[in-house]
Amino acid sequence: MKKLTKFLTSASIGLSLSAVIFLIKDYIYDSAMKEQDIFTILIAIFVPLFAIGTLLSVLLSKKIDRQKLLTFGLLFSGIFIILLTYLNIYHLQMLMPLMKTNSITLAVMWIARIMGGLTGLFIGISFGATVKNGVIHYILLVLFATGIFALGRFMPALISYEPILYTAGGLSLACALLNSYIETEKTKNE
């Protein structure tokens, strides 16, 4: 069970990281925001906060158990990826039909900035906690990220971005629950 959870955790972080970095660009571009260069802003916020999250994970791992950090990071990165995917222009127009399109576009831009930054922070925390688990998990993480990147670049017409982003968020949430369960069982047995 532990090996499966570690494998799924590595897959989840790799999928989340690559989905946000590589797939969100085309997803936002397809969401009627062609005139806005939101991806550059999202990545400009995502990357530094990812680095801060990784640094926080390293610093906090001395005071807080790595398993708790991993669960915390996975839980919130999953929530923010799902929210980032759901709150696009089309969904916001359905939720608020009386708002002007310009206002909705502006709202989506702010949502993408905030959610991109928060997602980067929590994926960074998860990444820092996972890399300490061993070289195999780091290699798996990189392989999943590379695989999603290849899918996004070489077969863009065949892939719908929304299911991949929802899968990344859902897998992060599932791994957070599995890691939480393992942590609870470990404390019960002690």
Model-derived regions, located:
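Residue-level signature of mid-helix packing/kink "hotspots" within the transmembrane helices
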Residues: 47-55, 121, 145-149
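C-terminal ends and interior cores of transmembrane alpha-helices
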Residues: 75-101
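Helix-to-loop junctions at the C-terminal end of transmembrane segments
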Residues: 53-66, 156
